[in-house]
Regions:
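Short alpha-helical donor nucleotide-sugar binding micro-motif in glycosyltransferases
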Residues: 130-131, 138-143
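Aromatic "clamp/platform" in nucleotide-sugar-dependent glycosyltransferases that forms part
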Residues: 151
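Conserved acidic donor-binding segment of nucleotide-sugar-dependent glycosyltransferases
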Residues: 184-193, 201-202
């Protein structure tokens, strides 16, 4: 924890009359780690807007010979990208008829490219870079499975967006959105074997 950031955050909370959190997970953190009065801390989950007709009309291509499994987000420690790569390596020991996509940018991108090469799975992995707007929904619709292996996620909007596109999702138990999503598979972010089993089963 960065003490300067913590001090600024706590000072703001100390002077607030009401603190709105995006999940019960975050609410507990605010109460326990920032020592706030539970009576002024409330959880209000995030939501997504209904898709526009333009996004609804994005075609969903079929992948009869290969499945596509996607990670989409910041490629940083908080998002757990290395667990996605390690789980992918385990899945590819069982079958080669899968392609993995890591869409996004971040300070761990080069490390993930190197890790993929070390695991010998570069021919099954794609790094298309940062996505925005309509591109994000095109990626979701091109995916057979979406994975969010976050180490720490106050909420996490991406699985809701993926599910809007009809893409089944696997999320970490450490994600706040898991409090409202019951039609997803949940694993611990560090349990790459459970994550690999979930990917393979879908």
């Amino acid at each position: 924890v960065n003490p300067t950031v913590y001090s600024i955050e706590k000072n703001g909370m100390d002077h607030a009359d009401c603190i709105m959190c995006v999940s019960e997970l975050t609410r507990r953190t605010v109460i326990n780690e920032y020592h706030q009065d539970p009576r002024k801390v409330f959880a209000m989950h995030n939501a997504v807007y209904p898709l526009s007709q333009e996004l609804l009309d994005i075609p969903r291509p079929e992948h009869p010979k290969e499945k596509v499994v996607t990670f989409l987000g910041r490629i940083t420690m908080q998002k757990g990208p290395e667990y996605f790569v390690e789980a992918a390596a385990l899945v590819l020991q069982r079958t080669r008829n899968i392609r993995f996509v890591m869409a996004g940018s971040g300070d761990m991108l080069n490390a993930m490219i190197n890790l993929v090469a070390e695991r010998g799975i570069a021919d099954r992995f794609h790094f298309p870079g940062f996505m925005k707007g309509k591109q994000v929904y095109e990626v979701y619709k091109n995916s057979d499975v979406f994975v969010m292996p976050s180490v720490s996620e106050p909420f996490g909007i991406a699985p809701l967006e993926a599910m809007q596109c009809g893409t089944p999702s696997i999320i970490s138990k450490q994600s706040g959105c898991g409090e409202i999503l019951d039609k997803v598979i949940k694993t611990d972010y560090w349990d790459i074997h459970a994550m690999a089993d979930a990917i393979y089963s879908l």
